[in-house]
Amino acid sequence: VVEYLNDNYSELKWAVAARNQEKIDAVKAELSCDVPAILLDSTKMEDIEKALSLTNLILTTVGPYQIYGNDILMMCAKHGVDYVDLCGEPGWMFEMQKHLATAKESGARIVHSCGFDSIPSDLGVMLLQKIAKERFGKPVEQVKCRVRSMKGEFSGGTAASLRATLGKL
């Protein structure tokens, strides 16, 4: 996400956040990324409050959300800050509906699962639309996608989300 924003949206005002400064510094150095950095430990309310005071949107890619996402989502809903994640934890998302009225009242928009298992297809559609515009002068109106086979493994975050979910059963 950081690499994509850095490479494609230089005019956008954004910052990178992480739980420890070393990780932030490493990512910024690796990508030659010159954006502000925010130290944000989602278990510390003061870190969340500070981050929310600096932004209009939190985009979080750090799960398990049922461990690291509760307070961030709750505070976004309370303070009118938009929230986007790539969560694949349906039980947690259902539980977070308790903040819906607060989010509506404050104007916060809550978007779950934006990118969860869809990044390959989203990128495919983006490239298809780019080619369609180049060849036909307009994007296609509808795209259908099917998966015949998959190779890959669970990421560390996916495995942690599974453990956290099973721990609640």
Model-derived features: where do they sit?
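Short, conserved SAM-binding/catalytic segment
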Residues: V27-D34
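Conserved glycine-rich Rossmann-like NAD(P)H-binding loop of the short-chain dehydrogenase/reductase
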Residues: S10-K23
